[in-house]
Amino acid sequence: MFRFILTTMLLAAILGCGGDNADKYTQEGFVYFQQQKYDEAIASYEKAIKAEPRAAAAYNMIGMAYRFKFNQQGAPEFRQKEMAAFQKAVEIDPKNWVAMINLATDHYADGEKGKAAALFKKALELNPNHPEKAEIEKMIAAGEPKP
């Protein structure tokens, strides 16, 4: 499942970035990401954003790199940067369901289940056949107010 998600994110990153340089840097960043060289990946994604400031997929991948750094080191600033990157990706491309799910997952993990539920719902509207739909629906239910 993890490979499917990463492959989906790479495809979204390549399609979501404009210009040859942005594509090149996004692909370079993904190679670093796969090698678990997260600082190098972030630097490459930042170059992609410099080449194409509306590269929502590059912001999403920066968020993923910070997520892995946070998971390894637990530094709160990595979580903040992770969430900010996902938020920026969603702001740039409100149909970017991948970034939306990533941001929702962070809110859910941080106990903000109401915020998470709203994002998860929107993501499922955009991608109703998501392979993890059943699990996402459980998280939506956990975040909705009880009657």
Where do the protein language model's features map onto the residues?
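C-terminal motif of bacterial Sec signal peptides marking the signal peptidase cleavage site
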Residues: 13-16
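Helix-start (N-cap) detector for alpha-helical repeat units in TPR-like alpha-solenoids
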Residues: 21-23, 56-57, 97-98, 131
